[in-house]
Amino acid sequence: MSEKKQSISAIREIFAAASETELPALYLEYEEDSRAGVQNLIQKYQKQEEALKKERERTEQMKIYEHKYEDLGWICGIDEVGRGPLAGPVVAGAVILPRDSKILYLNDSKQLTAKKRDELYDVIMREAVAVGIGYASPARIDEINILQATYEAMREAISKLSVKPDVLLN
């Protein structure tokens, strides 16, 4: 009597519920299943694991700067998130994270998807030591030019931090 195979949707649910440490065992368990859907599922999760590994490596490289300056005090990251009079105002954010923060995918906001920006917003607002937002209107951009308006928005964001930064990283 042959054993009935699990449905691909059931296997998909198993993978979705698995922790990162459980995935290698699942790959082994299902590697002999020749169905294309199962093999595609394994490949999908392996690609996600590889992407996560690369992101952790990228984040560790970024921490080189943090460790280089950590003895100086609070380190603040600054990012301009909106640009140009045609597209609206210039908005800048300034964030001080706890030392050795483990937040992944921190990057130039324009390189992130809208979904990832929303996810990171929640994490940053929950974990940050301090957050400041600065703004320059399209009229202000026309008045002083885009570059100066960007600097002005960044200065405003820094001034709104509840903790004074000692080092600024742009």
Task: Briefly describe each language-model feature range.
Residues 1-76, 80, 86-170:
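Acidic (Asp/Glu) carboxylate-rich active-site/surface patches
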